[in-house]
C-alpha cells in the first residue's frame, strides 16, 4: 500500500507544474469618449416618465403572460441546476450495495478437497466510495463555466424583460399615433363628403357646370381610401400589441386620452454602457464560460488521480450478517494517464478555442452594435425634436390664418373657398405634427432600451 501511495504522489508531483490557468478574456472594443448628446441615461422606472397609466398596465400584463419571458426564466433555472451538477463533480461519491452469491463446484473437479461442501452461499454488504482529485483544475473549470452560464442566463432573462417592455411601449405609442391619424382621416373624409354634396346641390341648381362635381367626387373617394388605409394601420398595430401582451384577438385595448409626456432621456457615458446593458453582460458571461471550458479541455491531457475504497461485512449464510460476520475493507489509489485517443482531446481543445474566438467575436459585435443603437436613437431624437418644433410653429401660423379667414368671411370680405383651403392646411399641419409627436416618443423608448433601461447586474 505504501508503495502504491508513493507512486501516486510522485505522479501527481510530476504533473503539478502543468495545471492550466484559464486565459484572460480579450479587452472590449474602445469606447468613444462621449456620445453626440449628453444627459443622464434612463432609470429603471423609465416607463413611468411618459405619464401614461395605460402603458404601465399593459407592461404588467405583458410580463405576466409573455412566453419569451417564461422561456428565458426556464433556461435560467436550467442553468442553476446544471451548476449544482457541475459543483458535485468535485465531491466524493458514496454508494451502498449488497450481493447474495450462490455457487457449486462440479464433482468432476479432481482437485476438490474431500470433506468440503461443494455448494457455498455468501452474502456481502459494502459501502463504496470514490473521489477523483481535481489536481489539474478540470472540475473547477467546469464549475466556473457553469457559473458563467448561470450569469449569462440571468442577464439574458433581464434582456428579454427589457426588450419586452420596450416593444410594448413602442407598439402602444404606435397604436395611439395610428388612432389619431385615423381620426384626422375620418374628419377629412367627412369634410370632402360635405363638399361633394354642396357641389351637387350647386350643379343641380344650374349655378355651375359639372366639372367641379367630378373633382369633388374624386377627392371624396380618395379620402375614403385613405380612411380605409388608416383603419388597417390601427388594426395592425393593435393586433401586434394584443399578441405581445397575450390578449385575445379583438379584445378591446385601453382608450388613452391624456397626452404622453416626452422624457428627457440621455445616453450617459459610453464607457458605462458595457455595465448598463444586460445583453452585453450576457455576451461577456458567455465568453467567460468559453474560456473556462477551454481550461477543462486542456486538463483532459493530464492524468486523473482517483481514490477508491470500500468497507463492509461478508457472511455465510445470510442470517449471520451483523452477528459475527467478517468485516473487510480496501483502499486503492490509482493514476490514469491518457496516451492515445485518436485525436479526441486535441479536437476538443481546438473546438474549445474556436468557441472562445466565436464568443469574443459575438461580444465585440454586441458592443459595437450597442454604440450604434445609441447614436442612431440620439440622431433620430434630435431630428424629430426639430421637426416637432417646426411643425408646431407651422400649425400655429396656419391656425392664425384660418382664424383671420373666418373673420373676413363673417365680415363679408372673403369667400368660402378661402376658408376651406385654410381648414385643409390646418388639418394637414395637425396631422403632420401628430405623426412627429408619436414617432418621437417611440424613438425615446428605443433610446431607453439602447442605454439599458436603468438595468444593473447587482
PLM feature spans:
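Hydrophobic, well-ordered secondary-structure elements that form the walls
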Residues: 307, 335, 352, 359, ...
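Terminal intrinsically disordered/low-complexity segments used for targeting and assembly
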Residues: 2-64, 123, 147, 231-275, ...
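Extracytoplasmic/secreted envelope proteins and their assembly/folding machinery
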Residues: 56-59, 73, 83, 172, ...
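Glycine-rich cofactor-pocket loops
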Residues: 208-212, 368-379, 414-417
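Small/polar-residue-enriched beta-strand and adjacent coil segments characteristic
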Residues: 45, 58, 73, 80, ...
Amino acid at each position: 500500500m505504501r508503495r502504491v501511495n508513493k507512486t501516486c504522489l510522485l505522479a501527481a508531483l510530476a504533473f503539478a507544474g502543468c495545471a492550466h490557468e484559464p486565459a484572460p478574456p480579450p479587452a472590449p472594443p474602445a469606447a468613444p469618449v462621449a456620445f453626440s448628446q449628453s444627459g443622464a441615461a434612463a432609470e429603471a422606472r423609465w416607463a413611468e416618465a411618459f405619464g401614461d397609466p395605460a402603458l404601465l398596465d399593459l407592461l404588467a400584463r405583458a410580463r405576466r403572460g409573455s412566453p419569451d419571458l417564461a422561456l428565458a426564466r426556464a433556461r435560467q433555472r436550467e442553468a442553476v441546476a446544471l451548476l449544482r451538477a457541475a459543483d458535485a463533480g468535485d465531491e466524493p461519491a458514496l454508494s451502498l450495495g449488497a450481493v447474495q452469491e450462490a455457487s457449486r463446484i462440479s464433482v468432476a473437479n479432481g482437485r476438490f478437497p474431500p470433506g468440503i461442501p461443494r455448494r457455498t452461499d455468501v452474502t456481502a454488504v459494502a459501502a463504496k466510495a470514490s473521489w477523483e482529485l481535481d489536481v489539474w483544475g478540470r472540475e473547477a473549470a467546469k464549475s466556473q463555466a457553469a457559473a458563467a452560464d448561470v450569469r449569462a442566463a440571468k442577464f439574458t432573462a433581464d434582456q428579454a424583460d427589457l426588450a419586452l417592455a420596450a416593444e410594448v411601449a413602442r407598439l402602444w405609442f404606435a397604436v395611439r399615433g395610428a388612432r389619431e391619424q385615423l381620426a384626422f382621416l375620418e374628419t377629412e373624409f367627412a369634410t370632402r363628403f360635405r363638399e361633394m354634396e354642396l357641389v351637387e346641390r350647386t350643379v343641380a341648381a344650374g349655378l355651375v357646370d359639372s366639372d367641379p362635381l367630378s373633382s369633388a367626387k374624386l377627392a371624396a373617394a380618395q379620402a375614403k381610401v385613405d380612411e380605409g388605409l388608416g383603419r388597417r394601420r390601427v388594426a395592425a398595430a393593435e393586433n401586434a400589441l394584443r399578441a405581445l401582451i397575450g390578449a385575445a384577438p379583438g379584445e378591446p385595448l385601453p382608450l388613452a386620452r391624456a397626452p404622453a409626456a416626452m422624457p428627457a432621456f440621455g445616453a450617459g457615458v459610453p464607457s458605462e454602457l458595457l455595465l448598463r446593458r444586460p445583453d452585453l453582460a450576457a455576451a461577456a458571461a458567455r465568453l467567460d464560460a468559453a474560456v473556462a471550458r477551454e481550461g477543462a479541455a486542456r486538463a483532459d491531457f493530464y492524468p486523473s488521480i482517483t481514490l477508491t475504497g470500500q468497507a463492509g461485512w461478508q457472511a455465510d449464510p445470510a442470517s449471520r450478517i451483523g452477528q459475527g460476520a467478517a468485516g473487510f475493507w480496501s483502499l486503492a489509489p490509482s493514476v490514469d494517464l491518457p496516451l492515445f485517443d485518436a485525436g479526441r482531446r486535441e479536437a476538443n481543445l481546438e473546438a474549445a478555442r474556436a468557441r472562445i474566438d466565436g464568443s469574443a467575436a459575438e461580444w465585440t459585435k454586441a458592443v459595437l452594435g450597442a454604440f450604434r443603437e445609441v447614436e442612431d436613437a440620439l440622431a433620430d431624437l434630435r431630428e424629430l425634436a426639430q421637426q416637432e418644433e417646426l411643425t408646431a410653429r407651422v400649425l400655429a401660423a396656419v391656425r392664425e390664418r384660418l382664424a383671420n379667414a373666418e373673420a373676413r368671411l363673417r365680415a363679408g370680405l372673403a369667400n368660402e373657398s378661402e376658408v376651406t383651403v385654410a381648414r385643409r392646411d390646418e388639418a394637414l399641419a395637425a396631422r403632420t405634427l401628430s405623426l412627429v409627436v408619436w414617432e418621437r416618443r417611440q424613438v425615446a423608448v428605443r433610446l431607453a432600451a439602447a442605454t439599458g433601461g436603468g438595468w444593473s447586474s447587482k
